[in-house]
Curated annotation (Swiss-Prot):
Membrane-traversing stretches: 124-144, 152-172, 182-202, 205-225, 250-270
Membrane topology: Multi-pass membrane protein
Name of the featured protein: Transmembrane protein DDB_G0269096
Signal peptide (residue range): none
Length: 285
C-alpha cells in the first residue's frame, strides 16, 4: 500500500512539472513573435525599394548569364576557328596530293601502255601491195602534174597527198582511210586554209597566227563532221603558206585539192582490190 501511494505522488509531481514546462515554452514563443513583429514594424521598406532590389537582382543574374554566354561564344568561336584551320589544312594537303598524283600519272603516260598492244609487222605480201599501190598513186599524180598541169600553169601534186598515200595504201582498213575521210578531210581543210589566207594573210595580219589557226580549225572541223583525215592539216597549212599568185582566192580548193584527192581515191579502188587480203573501201560514207 505504501508503495502504491509513493508511485501516485511521483506521477502527480511529473505531470505538474511537465505542464509548467509546456506553459513556459508557449509563453517564450509568443514573446519571440512579438519582438519580431515590433522589429519589422520599425523597418520602413517602400515598393520602390523593393522594385529597385528586384532590378538589381535581375541585372546581376543577367550579367552572370551574359558572361556565361560570352564565354560560351568565345569557346565556340575558338572551336570554329580550330575546325576551319583543320579543314583548310586538310584541303591544302588534299590539293597537294591530287597535284602530285596528277604529275605522276602524267609522266607515266610517257612510258606507254606496253609493247603487248603494238600491232604486228605485216607480212611480205601486205608490204608488197602497199609499195605497189603507193607507187602507182603518186606516179599518176606526178605524171599529170609534170606532163599536163604545169603547162597550163596548174598544180596537182602537193605534199599532203604523200601523207594520204601512207594511210589509204598502208592501212586501208583504218577509218581514216575511207573515202568520206579522204575527200571531206582534204576539202574542208582547203576551205579553212583559203578563208584564213584571204582573211589574215592578205590583210597584213600575223602570219604565224594564220598558220596555227588554219591547222587547228581544220582539225576541229574534221572532227565535228566525223571526217578526220590527218593529211588534211597539211593541206590547210600549204594553202596558207603558198605564195603563188594562182592560189589566191578559192581556186586552190578545186585544183589541186579536190581533183588530186579524187585521183588518189580512184587509184586506191583499183590497186587495193587486186590484193587477196584487201577489200577497199570498208564503207563509202
Amino acid at each position: 500500500m505504501e508503495d502504491r501511494n509513493l508511485e501516485r505522488n511521483i506521477g502527480s509531481d511529473i505531470s505538474s512539472s511537465s505542464s509548467i514546462d509546456m506553459s513556459q515554452s508557449t509563453n517564450l514563443e509568443i514573446s519571440i513573435d512579438q519582438s519580431i513583429n515590433r522589429n519589422l514594424e520599425k523597418i520602413d521598406i517602400s515598393e520602390d525599394d523593393v522594385r529597385r532590389g528586384e532590378k538589381k537582382i535581375e541585372s546581376f543574374e543577367n550579367g552572370e548569364n551574359n558572361n556565361n554566354n560570352n564565354n560560351n561564344n568565345n569557346n565556340n568561336n575558338n572551336n570554329n576557328n580550330n575546325n576551319n584551320n583543320k579543314n583548310e589544312d586538310r584541303k591544302f594537303k588534299k590539293t597537294l596530293f591530287c597535284i602530285k598524283m596528277y604529275i605522276i600519272q602524267y609522266f607515266k603516260k610517257w612510258l606507254g601502255t606496253g609493247k603487248d598492244k603494238r600491232p604486228p609487222i605485216p607480212d611480205l605480201e601486205e608490204i608488197g601491195w602497199t609499195w605497189l599501190a603507193s607507187f602507182t598513186g603518186i606516179l599518176v599524180l606526178a605524171l599529170i602534174h609534170y606532163r599536163e598541169a604545169l603547162d597550163a600553169q596548174m598544180q596537182v601534186l602537193i605534199g599532203s597527198f604523200a601523207a594520204s598515200a601512207v594511210i589509204i595504201f598502208g592501212v586501208p582498213k583504218s577509218p581514216l582511210a575511207q573515202p568520206r575521210n579522204l575527200i571531206m578531210g582534204h576539202f574542208l581543210s582547203a576551205v579553212v586554209g583559203s578563208v584564213i589566207r584571204v582573211a589574215l594573210v592578205y590583210t597584213n595580219a600575223n602570219f604565224e597566227v594564220a598558220c596555227a589557226l588554219a591547222v587547228s580549225l581544220s582539225i576541229m572541223l574534221m572532227q565535228f563532221t566525223n571526217s578526220l583525215h590527218p593529211p588534211g592539216g597539211a593541206t590547210a597549212l600549204i594553202c596558207v603558206m603558198g605564195v603563188e599568185q594562182r592560189w589566191r582566192g578559192f581556186y586552190f580548193i578545186f585544183v589541186p585539192i579536190l581533183s588530186g584527192a579524187l585521183i588518189m581515191l580512184l587509184t586506191a579502188l583499183v590497186v587495193n582490190n587486186f590484193a587477196r587480203k584487201r577489200s577497199y573501201p570498208l564503207y563509202w560514207w
